[in-house]
Amino acid sequence: MIRRLQDNGDLIRAFPRVHFVGIGGAGMTGIAEVMLTLGYEVSGSDNADNAATRRLATLGARVMRGHSAANVLGTDCVVVSSAIREDNPELMEARSQRIPIMPRAAMLAELMRFRHGIAVAGTHGKTTTTSLIAAVLSEGGLDPTFVIGGQLLAAGANAKLGAGQWLVVEADESDGSFLRLNPLVAVVTNIDADHLENYGNDFSRIKDAFTEFLQRLPFYGLALLCLDDPEVAELAGKARRHVMTYGIDAAADVRAEDVVQDGARMCFTLCLPEGKVIPVTLALPGRHNVLNALAASAVGWQLGVPPEVIGRALKSFVGIGRRFNDLGDVAIGNGACVRLIDDYGHHPRELEAVFAAVRGGWPDKRLVVAFQPHRYSRTRDQFDAFAAVLSSVDALVLSEVYPAGEVPIPGADAKALARAIRARGRSEPVVVGQVASLIEVLPDVLQEGDLLLMMGAGDIGSIAQRIAHDGFVFGEV
């Protein structure tokens, strides 16, 4: 019998059980939490536990360790992460049982059907920008739903079901899945050469995908574009939709003037349309974060959030997990301490932006970087850029590449990168095989008063947390 489904409540009653394959992924946990809050029965599987899966379990999700065909029995729909292989036993069982299978981005698009979507795309800055937009709209009383790729520290989660009509999400360009979304507002922060393997190693195809992303807006939709990024600026003439620009560039519709860094804060004048001007203190360091804040300000202004409320939201924003997280002072022995910062940056342009933020806020400190490269393909494709930016720091420790499912590529490992950096004559990198070895190696590199920046998108963040909590290990691990 075919049922007539009138609203989302009918959908939940008809198809209540949703299973997530790879539920621990950054893009999956937020969708799972929103669906739990909507009333779905959520289950999921992953090969490893993390804080997000443990949170889902406390909220009522059934989370299984490892993948098994039995995990999908009785499920009405299977949501799959892009990291899951086609021969996964749960996917194979779902196909044999004719259970609907939804890619992660397709399920995100389904959630967007019931709300006005704001999708944030761009090679860098998506998570911070999405979080800032959610903070501005929340401060403005719009109570948005949001799904973010990192933990919004103020909420203690990377997702929340709000009572308002707006849904704020990250739009992932890495595999082209952002083209499944149909937002009302599209933000593009920047466009860079990353994930080229998914675009035939052709940068022009990435740019074409962003153009198509904007063309998916309805005729009454809005494209918010960063004028400071030359690739994004080119989109303004191709969008064929309503466009608003933002940036530090003097021609931007929403812009920042008189930008000054004060330690971990940025101070600037926010210039909005119609002559609205307010002083802003942003509780995040770096010029790149000013641009992220301008995107959020533009969205807030478009949706009627008063300028003073926008300023208040930016000032009170406490950040996102693993985005320039100040973990405090850590002892290195003999009464000496260093300042520890943890950051997710894993692309040369991201490293450059974070290094600039450190030097702008703490110009007198020696910058020591512990970096875990992420993916052999990215290390190969950005090899010279990595060597250039990493050779600029005062001291460097490299761990082996975090593979993220890739097989090693000759000449794209940590030792090869160290040789290229050494050849530039500025620094002598230290290479460790396992990222956990940083705990015992770093004390020999560090000096009193250093700023230690631990960066990478792999598991180096867990090592930073261990150091912050337990300190360094002197002697044997």
UniProtKB/Swiss-Prot annotation:
It comes from Xylella fastidiosa (strain 9a5c). GO terms for biological process: cell division; cell wall organization; peptidoglycan biosynthetic process; regulation of cell shape. InterPro entries: Mur-like_cat_sf, Mur_ligase_C, Mur_ligase_C_dom_sf, Mur_ligase_cen, Mur_ligase_N, MurCDEF_pg_biosynth, UDP-N-AcMur_Ala_ligase_MurC. It is found in: Cytoplasm. The gene is murC. One of its GO terms (cellular component) is cytoplasm. ATP binds at residues 122-128. The keyword Transmembrane helix does not apply. This is UDP-N-acetylmuramate--L-alanine ligase.
